[in-house]
Amino acid sequence: MKMTTSEIDGIRNFIALLNSKKDSMVVVEGKRDSAALKKLGFSGMICEFHSFKGLVKFADSMDSYKRLILLLDLDRKGRYLTSKIISQLEHRIRIDLSFKRKLAMIMRGKIRHIEDLSMYESPE
C-alpha cells in the first residue's frame, strides 16, 4: 500500500512515542501484530494476548506492570477483547487506550489489524 508522507511521519512519531513508555507493557493480539511493531522499530515490551490460555490467566500475569498500552485490532474482535480486558483489569492496572486512538487517527481507517502495519514500511 502507498503511504503519504504525513502517514510515514505519523507512524515514525507514533513508534518513537511508544518506545518512550519504558514502564509500560504493550498488549497486542498475536505474533504477527508483535512482529509488525518490531519491524517498524518498536523496542519495548510486548505481550501477545493469544499466547495466554484465557482472560483470567492473562490478567493475573499483568499484575506486575504499572501500565498496559492496549493495541488490539480495530475490528469487532479487537473491540470485544479490549472491553473484556478493561473490565477485568481497570481497578488493578492503569490501562492506556490513547495509542490505539492515535494510530486510528494517523491511518484514517486504512488498517483494521495491527499486523497490517508491516505493509507500510517506508524507505529511510
Residue spans for each PLM region:
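TOPRIM fold recognition
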Residues: 31-40, 45, 49-124
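Phosphate-handling DNA/RNA-contact segment within nucleic-acid enzymes
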Residues: 1-25, 31-35, 58-59
